[in-house]
A protein has these predicted regions:
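Active-site HxH/HxHxD metal-binding segment of metal-dependent hydrolases
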Residues: 1-50
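Metallo-beta-lactamase
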Residues: 39-47, 57, 63-147
């Protein structure tokens, strides 16, 4: 497993998450109650073989560049794959459910918003998410338009 050091110890010790807050809005509160509330606070502990840091290249699929995106969680990482016009694997840094938007919860919403700006200077045509559908065209511009 590959993970940022700030979250690796959570997994090693069996903690599922740190305290987080729901992003404002009725829809986010409803989605939180349906999908997040009551989830276990613990997970089976696991070994993390590799700790990754910002701007590190991961030797997978011809090279993925890690982009540290704290906010959703302290160790949130997105990956940029330079092939096919650029593909961002945004994970939970943002969501694309009913449009490109913030995820439902963040450990620190303001930090999460600042982290999304890290993608403004990246070149990528496609973005995929932990939640929601992919953006298949002009994804970088959609990030700029949404999170400016």
């Amino acid at each position: 497993a590959w993970m940022h050091p700030l979250d690796a110890n959570l997994v090693r010790t069996g903690r599922a998450e740190r305290p987080h807050q729901v992003v404002p809005g009725l829809l986010n509160r409803m989605l939180f109650w349906v999908f997040v509330y009551g989830n276990p606070d613990t997970v089976p502990p696991a070994e993390i073989e590799y700790e990754i840091i910002d701007d590190q290249e991961i030797p997978v699929a011809g090279g993925l560049r890690a982009i540290h995106m704290p906010g959703h969680c302290a160790g949130q990482v997105a990956f940029l794959w330079s092939r096919h016009g650029g593909v961002v694997f945004a994970a939970d840094a943002a969501a694309n459910a009913m449009g490109l938007r913030l995820s439902i919860t963040y450990e620190d919403v303001d930090t999460g918003k600042k982290s999304l700006r890290k993608l403004f200077n990246q070149n990528f045509e496609v973005a995929v998410f932990g939640h929601g559908t992919p953006i298949k065209h002009a994804a970088a511009q959609q990030f700029r338009d949404t999170f400016t």
